[in-house]
A protein has these predicted regions:
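Positively charged n-region of N-terminal signal peptides that target proteins for export
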Residues: 1-7
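Short, linear, compositionally biased motifs with a strong N-terminal bias
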Residues: 10-11
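C-terminal segment of classical bacterial N-terminal signal peptides
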Residues: 14-23
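Active-site-adjacent loops and short helices of periplasmic peptidoglycan-processing enzymes
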Residues: 24-191, 198
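Extracytoplasmic
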Residues: 191-220
Length: 220
């Protein structure tokens, strides 16, 4: 589990801090990350953290509290709240989720859900986990909280509960996020919510270990 968590968080951070800042990578020299053993590790990522799953000990860090745009890594918190709702019995995997006009209008990564289309919670989680689907994420936010703004409020409450001091969410997708708009997170905070998702909700591995699947569109 320690190794899996480490690999997962490093993979997450490669997307979180390399892709959104790829334009800056060539301008910024590699820098050293500080490990718990005192050994310097040369990293080109703008920020990084490696956390031991069981204890929460920081094994390696570099600019861990720097606030940066999280992009689709935002969906780690979205998935955390979905798994939480499942385990609390508020929703079931077989429940139908209706897609609103707003959810269907999401751009970016999506599975092209149509207005009034219905899918099960199980399928929506697949779409979010495998395709990073913005439309499915918003549909699930509306299913759980009634609206995306209400769901985002829950995301920020959970972030506070987890001690994520350098995070603020403005949406449940990470779509069109801008640090100036107030949507940001940090390497350490990503580590905290990744640990919460993996350690507290192991059922997510059913979805996160799948790299491809198909869905059938269902419209009324």
């Amino acid at each position: 589990m320690k190794q899996l968590l480490g690999i997962f968080i490093l993979a997450v951070l490669s997307l979180f801090f390399v892709a959104p800042f790829s334009y800056a990578q060539s301008k910024a020299p590699a820098g050293n990350a500080e490990s718990s053993s005192g050994q310097a590790v040369n990293l080109t990522a703008k920020a990084a953290v490696l956390i031991e799953g069981n204890s929460g000990e920081i094994i390696l860090e570099k600019n861990k509290d720097t606030e940066l745009v999280p992009a689709s890594i935002t969906k780690i918190m979205t998935l955390t709240l979905i798994m939480e709702a499942l385990e609390e019995g508020k929703i079931q995997l077989t429940d139908s989720v209706s897609v609103s006009e707003y959810a269907a209008s999401m751009g970016g990564s999506q599975v092209f859900l149509e207005p009034n289309e219905t899918q099960t919670v199980d399928t929506m989680i697949k779409c979010i986990s495998i395709a990073s689907a913005n439309d499915a994420a918003v549909a699930m936010a509306e299913k759980i909280a009634g609206s995306e703004p209400n769901f985002v409020k829950k995301m920020n409450e959970k972030a506070k509960e987890l001690g994520m001091k350098h995070t603020q969410f403005k949406n449940c997708t990470g779509l069109d996020d801008d640090i100036k708009s107030g949507h940001f997170s940090s390497a350490y905070d990503v580590g905290l919510m990744s640990r919460e998702l993996i350690m507290k909700h192991p059922g997510i591995s059913k979805y996160s270990t799948v790299w491809m699947d198909t869905i059938t569109h269902k419209t009324k």
